Amino acid sequence: MVVTSNADRICTGITSSNSPHVVKTATQGEVNVTGVIPLTTTPTKSHFANLKGTKTRGKLCPKCLNCTDLDVALGRPKCMGTIPSAKASILHEVKPVTSGCFPIMHDRTKIRQLPNLLRGYENIRLSTHNVINAEAAPGGPYIVGTSGSCPNVTNGNGFFATMAWAVPKNNNNKTATNPLTVEVPFICTEGEDQITVWGFHSDDETQMVKLYGDSKPQKFTSSANGVTTHYVSQIGGFPKQAEDGGLPQSGRIVVDYMVQKSGKTGTITYQRGILLPQKVWCASGRSKVIKGSLPLIGEADCLHEKYGGLNKSKPYYTGEHAKAIGNCPIWVKTPLKLANGTKYRPPAKLLKE
């Protein structure tokens, strides 16, 4: 190829304009380049969403209206329903709210943690059978107590499905008793964890004598999976309290739970006022849990505790560093850029003779 020109001299080189792109390199420090691809984004806060490609759990029982997660976990009447399986869960109650029904001394035990424990499982179901025959338990015979403060689906007196309020049936066994022990068998399917809820009731001296024949503080112990917990009941001193428009109650209940691993038996040692386990939670698999808020709107690649639902537009992000689950960008302290051009060189100058 022949090139002709009237110019005094032909110069070859890189044609370039002023470059606004600066990248930091490992060997040469800051370098101007002709082009870059941004690799980071700084998210803005958004609502939480369903995680793409998997089921995301918000409330434990979405169809249980006007129920807290603790209501569902305890089996409160009118709060019974199916808990959908989920591989990801939103911890929307960092400190779960109280349950209604009968007044509970929530802060004496770890019972507030029960909804969050259940949330950490992929599959959760309530057993169809009772784990203990409460009427025939040691220290009986018993009748199963109910309360007008805990109405069932027909608006009759009810109680939590996970527990049976064991009240001595007749005057012959309404007496003080030495500690009694009942075994809690494993009734879930092999490979599942069994979460067994139990508790005890106490009242003022007059009501304790009327119900149980003993007004002294009662002792209770649970043991499962190497964990043993002891309680002593408080007698009296409670102001009357009503839950959700129910009858004012002078008594209180203390509720706890124990986790039984597959095939393992638990034990409960008790005196008067025991709330014996009934239906138990059978749980398996693991659900990734992240703190967030409801409702879940739409879908997102990633759920981030600080930013909510994120769609991954870049491989990295800057901003607040926090727990995230899903297909998430990686947190970096400073923005990253990928140079997709060449090192910037000033335009060549024509040489004059």
Curated annotation (Swiss-Prot):
Glycans are attached at N32, N66, N152, N173, N311, N340. It is found in: Virion membrane; Host apical cell membrane. InterPro entries: Capsid_hemagglutn (IPR008980), Hemagglutn_HA1_a/b_dom_sf (IPR013828), Hemagglutn_influenz_A/B (IPR001364). The keyword Glycoprotein applies. It is a single-pass type I membrane protein. GO terms for cellular component: host cell plasma membrane; membrane; viral envelope; virion membrane. GO terms for molecular function: host cell surface receptor binding. Pfam families: Hemagglutinin (PF00509). Its main location: virion. In natural infection, inactive HA is matured into HA1 and HA2 outside the cell by one or more trypsin-like, arginine-specific endoprotease secreted by the bronchial epithelial cells. One identified protease that may be involved in this process is secreted in lungs by club cells. Palmitoylated. Keywords: Disulfide bond, Fusion of virus membrane with host endosomal membrane, Fusion of virus membrane with host membrane, Glycoprotein, Hemagglutinin, Host cell membrane, Host membrane, Host-virus interaction, Lipoprotein, Membrane, Palmitate, Signal, Transmembrane, Viral attachment to host cell, Viral envelope protein, Viral penetration into host cytoplasm, Virion, Virus entry into host cell. Residues 1-7 form the signal peptide. GO terms for biological process: fusion of virus membrane with host endosome membrane; fusion of virus membrane with host plasma membrane; symbiont entry into host cell; virion attachment to host cell. Binds to sialic acid-containing receptors on the cell surface, bringing about the attachment of the virus particle to the cell. Plays a major role in the determination of host range restriction and virulence. Class I viral fusion protein. Responsible for penetration of the virus into the cell cytoplasm by mediating the fusion of the membrane of the endocytosed virus particle with the endosomal membrane. Low pH in endosomes induce an irreversible conformational change in HA2, releasing the fusion hydrophobic peptide. Several trimers are required to form a competent fusion pore. Belongs to the influenza viruses hemagglutinin family. Homotrimer of disulfide-linked HA1-HA2. This is Hemagglutinin. It comes from Influenza B virus (strain B/Ann Arbor/1/1986). The gene is HA.
